[in-house]
Amino acid sequence: ACIPRGEICTDDCECCGCDNECYCPIGSSLGIFKCSCAHANKYFCNRKKEKCKKA
């Protein structure tokens, strides 16, 4: 999947389609901030894509 940068996401799989990661700011576990897609790199996403395919 490829959620645009800045859009809310739940995990990296949703953002890695366009080499972004799902970035969760500190405090996101408390529900104050939402995780959103942020710029990552191909190496990061290639590793994640293997996991995402299995999911």
UniProtKB/Swiss-Prot annotation:
Keywords: Calcium channel impairing toxin, Disulfide bond, Ion channel impairing toxin, Knottin, Neurotoxin, Secreted, Toxin, Voltage-gated calcium channel impairing toxin. Disulfide bonds join C2-C16, C9-C22, C15-C37, C24-C35, C45-C52. It comes from the Eukaryota. Belongs to the neurotoxin 09 (Tx3-6) family. The presence of a 'disulfide through disulfide knot' structurally defines this protein as a knottin. Expressed by the venom gland. Its main location: secreted. GO terms for molecular function: calcium channel regulator activity; toxin activity. This is Omega-ctenitoxin-Pr2a. The keyword Disulfide bond applies. One of its GO terms (cellular component) is extracellular region. It is found in: Secreted. Antagonist of L-type calcium channels (Cav1/CACNA1). In vivo, causes paralysis in posterior limbs, and gradual decrease in movement and aggression during 24 hours after intracerebroventricular injection in mice at dose levels of 3 ug per mouse.
